[in-house]
């Protein structure tokens, strides 16, 4: 009886166990290249209790965002003020932000254009170090950004964890790749001369990001553009400006100059079309709809001069093909995860399933049962799917 009453956790901790030396810990998954982002086990009561408290304390008051382009309070009062509410509870006000006007957009473009050469001449290692510092700061601020992901973007707890981790991974990945790929390379000289190859930033890059990944995609676009030596104008989704602003503040804290990285929240006609049409903008990065990508493409094509690169990640018709060799339980779990995580609002979400006739009825019946078990509700509640 005494042995049965012993605490199994204490017994496990007392064992002289050791991990296999050739199996890296999750943190060291990428070896010497870079650190992996820190995961959180939401099924662990201790971790969950600590995280819940930190999240509760991360937003102590209403967040108010003011464009850094203007310092004149009188001018700020003339801008349109937008109220940000919790999508699960519209009575809960999270914060406020001001939309930029045409004058602010013009100032931002001019500022980014004027400092493009100075930023491009900053050593790539220094730019990469800034991204590493931002990654560390972002990881330390996980409770804040999880809180924003849930309250501003309506994400579930696990999705919020994944959102922060993906952003951290983007920062470290691009920092490492930039140092390895964008530094000075000495080429062979057939006659003994010194030939060197060095990549140079294009200039001003306009980044347009969506609401469904308000931190990860927003961060990834900006990180890639900045570390490559470009100045950035970033237009976040109007639904997730607070998240974008808090991330930009981390960039500034890490040493990125304010005129190198500028946030321009606003309407499409003011903060979108005017920037795309400006000939001083050298490239556009978009994650959004096919229609938006086509509209930007046509706008860029109408401009005089050299071809302007458009890097666009848009939607698609994602499919799954299931034959009789597949384990039905696993198929159903994969369908539910791919089709319904984030309420299906992902460019990678499953749209169509093709099932072999012989297993179709069984699979569909089990899928219907799994869907009936899904809980729709407040994303702040752990039981919500």
Q: What feature does the model see in each segment?
A:
Residues 1-110, 114-117, 121-136, 162-165, ...:
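Terminal low-complexity tails and localization/encapsulation signals of metabolic enzymes
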Residues 8, 250-255, 277, 283, ...:
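ALDH superfamily catalytic-core signature
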Residues 85-87, 148-152, 163, 174, ...:
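Generic beta-strand/beta-sheet core signal
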Residues 91, 112, 127, 149, ...:
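Residue-level signal for inorganic ion chemistry
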Residues 92-96, 105-108, 121-128, 146-148, ...:
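Extended hydrophobic-aromatic, low-complexity segments
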Residues 139-145, 367:
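Extended, amphipathic, non-transmembrane alpha-helical segments
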Residues 184-258, 315, 329:
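Conserved small-residue-rich beta-alpha loop and adjacent elements
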Residues 194-196, 262-285:
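A structured beta-alpha segment of the ubiquitous adenosine-cofactor-binding alpha/beta core
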């Amino acid at each position: 009886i005494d042995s049965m009453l012993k605490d199994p956790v204490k017994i496990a901790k007392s064992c002289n166990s050791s991990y296999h030396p050739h199996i890296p810990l999750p943190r060291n998954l990428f070896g010497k290249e870079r650190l992996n982002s820190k995961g959180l086990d939401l099924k662990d009561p201790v971790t969950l209790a600590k995280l819940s408290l930190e999240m509760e304390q991360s937003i102590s008051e209403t967040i108010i965002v003011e464009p850094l382009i203007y310092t004149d309070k009188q001018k700020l009062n003339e801008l349109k003020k937008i109220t940000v509410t919790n999508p699960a509870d519209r009575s809960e006000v999270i914060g406020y932000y001001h939309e930029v006007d045409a004058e602010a957009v013009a100032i931002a473009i001019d500022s980014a254009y004027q400092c493009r050469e100075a930023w491009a001449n900053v050593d790539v290692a220094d730019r990469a170090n800034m991204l590493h510092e931002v990654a560390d700061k972002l990881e330390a601020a996980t409770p804040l950004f999880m809180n924003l992901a849930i309250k501003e973007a309506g994400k579930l707890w696990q999705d919020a964890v994944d959102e922060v981790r993906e952003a951290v991974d983007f920062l470290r990945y691009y920092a490492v790749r930039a140092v390895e790929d964008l530094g000075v390379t000495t080429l062979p000289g057939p006659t003994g001369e010194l030939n060197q190859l060095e990549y140079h930033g294009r200039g001003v890059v306009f980044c347009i990001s969506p609401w469904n990944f308000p931190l990860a995609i927003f961060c990834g676009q900006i990180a890639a553009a900045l570390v490559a030596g470009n100045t950035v104008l970033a237009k976040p989704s109007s639904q997730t400006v607070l998240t974008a602003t808090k991330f930009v503040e981390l960039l500034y804290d890490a040493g990125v100059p304010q005129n190198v990285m500028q946030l321009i929240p606003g309407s499409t006609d003011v903060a979108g079309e005017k920037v795309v049409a400006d000939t001083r903008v050298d490239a556009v990065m978009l994650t959004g709809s096919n229609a938006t990508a086509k509209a930007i493409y046509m706008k860029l094509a109408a401009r005089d001069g050299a071809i302007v690169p458009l890097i666009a990640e848009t939607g698609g018709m994602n499919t799954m093909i299931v034959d009789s060799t597949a384990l039905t339980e696993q198929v159903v779990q994969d369908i539910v995860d791919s089709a319904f995580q984030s309420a299906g609002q992902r460019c990678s979400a499953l749209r169509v399933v093709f099932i072999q006739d012989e297993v179709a009825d069984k699979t569909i019946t089990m899928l219907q049962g799994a869907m009936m078990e899904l809980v729709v509700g407040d994303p702040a509640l752990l039981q919500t799917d």
